[in-house]
């Protein structure tokens, strides 16, 4: 656990860099429709960001989009954002990455609990990140996490989460580091072994988040029920584009996207929503990588 989903993204990339899975200057692909802190750590840590276009019917990178992007840019890593609780054919994307020797990691901050063909989003890549900010599937007020089944990455995440020291890894691994680098026992608690930050959560954030895990299934089930209601109503209106989510067998969405077919319809419905005091916002965020900044 870390202090935010944004920190989870930063920590994951730094830990992969520490392990030499990726290096400064490597090209990292990311979804053209994403949150700012899926992109920003890529830039901040010295990688080259490569936006990959999305399929408007799924709002996510499709295998076709990825293949088209690979013809122009040879990426070392794909930081795939599972947008708003959905995915395209992530199984096919995983196979492409494996074939091309591309490291696949997932930003699953908007999709906790969603399943593609019976497999949870967030379990297709080498690691995945989650956010527990207010409004997400579970909330610890502020918080996030990184998940992986790789022991070396797990240790490095714990090291880099807390300054670069060893205090949070198990004693046997800690001893092996101390022996390898010949660290004097007096200094071992204050020796920093790799690049890191202080991204630790507070005890109260951890307590609140842990408590909500006991009814996570209830939360995501209710989200799926709500999604079906919104989707049914939206599909009755010819002004909106329909989503194609046939391969999603469980949808734990973050919000419901309404996509108008024309700019005029967009302006019309924006006014209607505001008049009826219904909160609306962009699907995620503006296209930051096109900004002069």
For the regions a protein language model found, what residue spans apply to each?
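Active-site phosphate-binding strand-loop segment of PLP-dependent enzymes
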Residues: 57-156
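PLP-dependent aminotransferase class I/II
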Residues: 5-6, 64, 68, 77-81, ...
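Phosphate-binding glycine-rich loop
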Residues: 1-27, 41-43, 51
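Hydrophobic/aromatic ligand-binding patch that stacks against planar heteroaromatic rings
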Residues: 41-42, 96, 204
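Conserved coil-to-alpha-helix start sites within the AMP-binding
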Residues: 33-39
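Short beta->alpha connector loops at strand-helix junctions that form conserved
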Residues: 32, 51-55
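Structured binding elements
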Residues: 46
